[in-house]
Amino acid sequence: MTATTAESGRPDQPPTAEAGRPVRLTLTRRAGRAPRHLADLTRQERRDVAVSLGQPAFRADQVARHYYARLIAADEPEAMTDLPERDRQPLLDALLPRLLVPVRTLSCDDGLTRKTAWRTVDGASLESVIMRYPDRATVCVSSQAGCGMGCPFCATGQGGLTRNLSTAEIVEQVVHAARVLRRRELAGGETRLSNVVFMGMGEPLANYAAVIAALRRLTAHPPEGLGLSARGLTVSTVGLVPAIRRLAGEGLPVTLAVSLHAPDDVLRNELVPINTRWPVVEVLAAAWEYAEVTGRRVSVEYALIDGVNDDVGRADALADLLVGRLAHVNLIPLNPTGGSSWRASAPAGQRAFVRRLRDRGIVTTVRDTRGREIAAACGQLAAEPAGKPERTDRPEQVGSDRLVEFGAVGSTTPDGDRVLR
């Protein structure tokens, strides 16, 4: 089954391994499609929409400026005072249709972390998470409703894939986060969104066209986009080799995060099933090509699972793969999910793994976990059942403790990882 680009409706060709083996990217499929939205359109396309409504082309640029620069929502037409009142609603209906409906919002970490469960107009479910730190604000976005990669320790993978998200559905998650931060709806006062990580639901590179278009919208300056720095964007992948190589040629110096989780094929075949198509050596070869082309350090994601992949022998094997490379290891103590009996490595085991990598000269970070109490941490996003939408003005507060790994002293990365010194 081919993957469909929601913004165009055209099927993408499924990625293949070098030997020509097709890769199945879906477990389930829903025939849904998002409405056409301003964020799906080029400047000329959106101007054509305005003209088709009998309005001057520049009206579309005004709407885009309100959306990207002023972060005004479609249900706030009264704030768009430069648009004639009689012309506002037709323009908004055509360019800013409703894409995502909030179903539930939860907060933790003293209000510094907020998870929103969304429902699309065709009933698909997804989640995004906003996280505020002392020096930055990050949103973790979904690129698909569900995921077809089938990783057994990940709640999203256990649920299967519903459909790809459109470019606009991805961008809307980011615009919403920027709006929340600007309007002081998160603890800590007003701030600007600085980082976007494609680490929510889905495999971003399996929805390649929509994700690339979203990255371009996020980095373009208003009224074409949000004007974020590409260096503040991170795209995670389980290792779709052809797509990694293609990404290197896009001229977008985003951070590539490779979800490795094991240094050997025997174990990784079990933890990351796509490894049977592209083994570890091929995935890392593509990652090193990406680093060479972009000059960006590759983040190697590694979930520490008690008694599975956390022994020092595997730490040595991982170091052998990475020594001398433009990369760092981001260790993630496994977060609990309902469908898995695995658990995080014990603190002593985590420390031993970190020590072994550091002794080999590998830059190592340990994720400063956010959102575990509200199932918003890495690997926990599974989308709550779509029910009656509710307003998110007063998110439910759950817990307040922030997990600090090992009491380590050091700086943190834009993704919230603690650099151990």
UniProtKB/Swiss-Prot annotation:
Catalytic residues, chain numbering: E127, C378
Keyword presence, Coiled coil: no
Names of the cofactor(s): [4Fe-4S] cluster
E.C. designation(s): 2.1.1.192
Record's cofactor remark: Binds 1 [4Fe-4S] cluster. The cluster is coordinated with 3 cysteines and an exchangeable S-adenosyl-L-methionine.
Subcellular location: Cytoplasm
Chain spans, region Disordered: 1-23, 383-421
Reaction catalysed by this enzyme: adenosine(2503) in 23S rRNA + 2 reduced [2Fe-2S]-[ferredoxin] + 2 S-adenosyl-L-methionine = 2-methyladenosine(2503) in 23S rRNA + 5'-deoxyadenosine + L-methionine + 2 oxidized [2Fe-2S]-[ferredoxin] + S-adenosyl-L-homocysteine; adenosine(37) in tRNA + 2 reduced [2Fe-2S]-[ferredoxin] + 2 S-adenosyl-L-methionine = 2-methyladenosine(37) in tRNA + 5'-deoxyadenosine + L-methionine + 2 oxidized [2Fe-2S]-[ferredoxin] + S-adenosyl-L-homocysteine
Pfam families: Radical_SAM
Enzyme class: transferase
Binding site for S-adenosyl-L-methionine: G202, E203, S236, S259, L260, H261, N335
Radical SAM core domain residues: 133-372
Sorted UniProt keywords: 4Fe-4S, Cytoplasm, Disulfide bond, Iron, Iron-sulfur, Metal-binding, Methyltransferase, rRNA processing, S-adenosyl-L-methionine, Transferase, tRNA processing
Cystines in this chain: C140-C378
Alphabetized SUPFAM superfamilies for the sequence: Radical SAM enzymes
A Gene Ontology biological process term: tRNA methylation
Entry similarity comment: Belongs to the radical SAM superfamily. RlmN family.
Function: Specifically methylates position 2 of adenine 2503 in 23S rRNA and position 2 of adenine 37 in tRNAs.
Protein name per the record: Probable dual-specificity RNA methyltransferase RlmN
